[in-house]
Amino acid sequence: MKITDLKPTIVWKFFHQVTQVPRPSKKEGKMIEFLESFAKEYKIAIKKDEAGNLLMSKPATPGMEDRPVVVLQSHMDMVCEKNNGTKHDFDNDPIETIVDGEWLRANGTTLGADNGIGVAAELALLASDDIQHGPIECLFTVDEETGLTGAKALKEGFMTGDILLNLDSEDEGEIFMGCAGGKDTQATFHYEPVPTSDKMQYFRIDVKGLNGGHSGGEIHKGLGNANKILVRFLFLLKKKYDFVLCSIDGGNLRNAIAREAHAVIGLHPENKEDVRILLNHFAADVENELKHVDPSVQLAMESTDRPEYHIDNATAEKLIYALHACPHGVIGMSHDIEGLVETSTNLASIKMKEGNTILIGTSQRSSIDSCKIAIANTVASTFLLAGADVKHGDGYPGWAPNPDSKILKIAQETYKRLFNKDAKIMAIHAGLECGLFLEKYPKLDMISFGPTLRDVHSPNERIEIATVGLWWSHLLELLKSIPAK
């Protein structure tokens, strides 16, 4: 079975088209062209702002003209992650999709259902002539995944809707009424390159096989973080043996839990077998710790060519200690909503850069703004104590739940009517663009909902096929049921 054989046909048709268009964050040009061509083909009114956000407008169907304007919103960019050994150019290659039982996934890469399925649903709605709805506006934002820059750049008056349906949630049957705010903290270490010695032997230490995942929606699962595992081993090594750190690299994206990390070290030949034994014992500990969530974790040590330089020992020691001390994971749970993560932090990436610098990327989230700032300052303090330069990003606001939301009530009623069961009303620890929309449009009545996705922001990303039809049915029933102004 192929993606084009799936039901509802019109949604999967457009999702397939979306997967054929490269759309990395900050490189959405081809996607913008695709959407503009769609609007031209279907004679849909369209406008674009300076950031590249697109808004398509469609009049009400006959008899629905007195309904309020509804904005449907999704982001057009996708997280670009692939497995080691997977050959894929995200700037140019289409995503290869595979129907795998009850799920649709990609072939060794992220699928881009986050948030391509939302884009597809909007296009299906715009292209259809047999769906009842009031006046609608479909908003497609850019660069949600790496900075929310599209939502931040949105100007007052660009859209006119009174109600906004965000299509960027990942559990069918759950309706979201709030989300966390976020802030990034970056640390930069400066080091002196020291010529390596031919009296040492050099080895690459790898951490791989982890699932990774979304650092908001999946932080509560206790998934392994490759950066933390690698640094934990280097810390143990530092306590027992003399070695030099030549290079270190781990993770990629601020909003993804690191799946892979590696370091190149130099050892005295007489210590190499003892270090292998130490690594094997450590690997056994990690495998035991993660057996329920990351059973495929692997740690490996292989000989490698002698690098030209290593990081000066004083900086390497401070780097290892600071990374080991840097908090990662859930910091606190909500006292207002049972089961909701309130505050968390993600040690996202470790990258060696030009100018003899090492850049550490971290991301903090909280549904309470003061807690978000507090954990960002905790992370900053860890690196400041080690002599690093630290800076914070601007961050983005959370979306405070509104229990009196009219659209929430309609969404609950329509779900119950369709499926004879109650939808779960939730807040999400992940960041959504909704908080930024409220800054510019404070009277917006909003909810977020979507089909079931798993392992987003990783090559294991997949979408549960049957839930797309359920979500689509709910969306259509909801649009039909919104009362006159």
Walk through the language-model features, giving the residues of each:
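Active-site-adjacent substrate-binding region
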Residues: N225, R232-I248, G393-G395, P401-L444
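His/Asp/Glu-rich mid-to-C-terminal helical/loop segments that flank catalytic regions of hydrolases
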Residues: G157, L223-K240, H268-K272, K318-H324, ...
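Midchain, well-structured core segments that form catalytic/ion-binding scaffolds
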Residues: E102-R105, E145, K152, E156-R365
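Glycine/charged-rich beta-loop-alpha catalytic/anionic-binding loops adjacent to active sites
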Residues: I95-T109, N211-G213, K416-K421, T452-V456
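Acidic/His- and Gly-rich active-site-bordering loop/insert found
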Residues: K2-W103
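Active-site metal-coordination/substrate-binding segment of hydrolases
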Residues: M64-T146, A151-D162, K199-Y202, N313-E317, ...
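Acidic, glycine-rich active-site loops and adjacent beta-strand->loop/helix elements
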Residues: M76-M78, L139-G147, S169-E172, N211, ...
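Zn-dependent metallopeptidase/amidohydrolase metal-coordination segment
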Residues: I3, P8-V11, H335, E342-I358, ...
